[in-house]
């Protein structure tokens, strides 16, 4: 079983005389910065001069510097920019300003695990990854609670990296809930697999396959949308709150019987494909493909996204959502 750390396992004292730089001020960045500051830690924010978040960070009372300057000033640098821009930001602004004994930190292991960022041997490298969006991290902190997080030590140059990482996790409120020890490899590979096989790729493919099956059989697209997409939230919310068994407790016996007698057909069909997807993540094939795709300005990425935007389920959904006053009515673009 995993090693889990709580409040009593961490001390903020090790950060008392240090400065933490938060690189980025988006969903996670603003939550980390505010929570750390409220925990008594000196925090500065690193943003490009043209960043739309610069004004917000300043209004929140932070000193805002360029990433180069912030790296010079800080002892701990948490990099919370998107994965795809991190290597360039690191190479241009962070690496030249690192000195022995500093620490860099991440909330996702992609660039370290796949070698897109290779830190010098004389600095600490760790990860603190909350398992929830930034607004939840902030809200739970303000409520005196916390969001569980992952922690990993990639490189301990000072001998104090784990203590620094745990202090950081405590500063954002994560140790109130529990911090699970992992590795950069495990976090990266499981995160990518979950996104591809279940949460994003798997879920959207299942929705489209179900929708198309009903429409091709002559059923109205509106009915197919309700049964294969709209009602998914009801089930996912139950699973999220109570687990699979708890969800089954809340649905009809007919739905339950169909679940346990027919669901295995999908299971048996997709599990071998999931294993292949995991292999492509483990051997670096997906990472190489994604890195090259970005270097080529994302032609396949953009083409596939645009193709899916034209799917009938999108047209039908847009019309049906206008009938639902409890939704915002504002379409995301």
Swiss-Prot record:
Domain KARI C-terminal knotted: residue ranges: 183-327
Query: What Gene Ontology cellular component terms go with this record?
Result: cytosol
Q: By its UniProt entry, which InterPro entries does this protein fall under?
A: 6-PGluconate_DH-like_C_sf, KARI, KARI_C, KARI_N, KARI_prok, NAD(P)-bd_dom_sf
* Transmembrane parts of this sequence: none
Entry's EC annotation: 1.1.1.383
Active site: residue positions: 108
Q: In which pathway does it act?
A: Amino-acid biosynthesis; L-isoleucine biosynthesis; L-isoleucine from 2-oxobutanoate: step 2/4; Amino-acid biosynthesis; L-valine biosynthesis; L-valine from pyruvate: step 2/4
Functionally, this protein is described as follows: Involved in the biosynthesis of branched-chain amino acids (BCAA). Catalyzes an alkyl-migration followed by a ketol-acid reduction of (S)-2-acetolactate (S2AL) to yield (R)-2,3-dihydroxy-isovalerate. In the isomerase reaction, S2AL is rearranged via a Mg-dependent methyl migration to produce 3-hydroxy-3-methyl-2-ketobutyrate (HMKB). In the reductase reaction, this 2-ketoacid undergoes a metal-dependent reduction by NADPH or NADH to yield (R)-2,3-dihydroxy-isovalerate.
Identification of the protein by name: Ketol-acid reductoisomerase (NAD(P)(+))
């Amino acid at each position: 079983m995993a090693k889990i750390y709580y409040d009593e396992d961490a001390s903020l004292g090790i950060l008392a005389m240090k400065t933490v730089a938060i690189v980025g001020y988006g969903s996670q960045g603003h939550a980390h910065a505010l929570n750390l500051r409220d925990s008594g830690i000196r925090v500065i924010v690193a943003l490009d001069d043209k960043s739309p978040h610069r004004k917000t960070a300043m209004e929140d009372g932070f000193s805002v510097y360029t990433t180069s300057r912030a790296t010079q000033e800080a002892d701990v640098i948490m990099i919370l920019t998107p994965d795809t821009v991190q290597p360039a930001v690191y190479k241009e602004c962070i690496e030249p300003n690192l000195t022995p004994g500093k620490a860099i930190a991440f909330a996702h292991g992609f660039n370290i695990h796949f070698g897109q960022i290779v830190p010098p041997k004389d600095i600490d490298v760790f990860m603190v990854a909350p398992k929830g969006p930034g607004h939840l991290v902030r809200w739970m902190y303000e409520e005196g609670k916390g969001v569980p997080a992952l922690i990993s030590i990639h490189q301990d140059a000072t001998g104090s990296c784990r203590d620094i990482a745990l202090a950081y996790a405590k500063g954002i409120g994560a140790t109130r809930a529990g911090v699970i020890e992992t590795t950069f490899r495990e976090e990266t590979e499981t995160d990518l697999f979950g996104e591809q096989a279940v949460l994003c790729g798997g879920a959207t493919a299942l929705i489209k396959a179900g929708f198309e099956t009903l429409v091709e059989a002559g059923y109205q697209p509106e009915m197919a949308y309700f049964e294969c997409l709209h009602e998914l939230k009801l089930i996912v919310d139950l699973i999220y709150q109570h687990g699979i068994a708890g969800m089954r407790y809340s649905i009809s016996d007919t739905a339950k019987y169909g679940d346990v007698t027919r669901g295995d057909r999908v299971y048996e069909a997709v599990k071998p494909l999931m294993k292949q997807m995991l292999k492509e993540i483990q051997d670096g094939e997906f990472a190489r493909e994604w890195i090259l795709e970005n270097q080529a300005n994302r032609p396949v990425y953009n083409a596939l996204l645009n193709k899916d935007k034209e799917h009938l389920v999108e047209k039908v959904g847009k019309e049906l959502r206008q009938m639902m006053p409890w939704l915002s009515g504002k379409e995301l673009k």
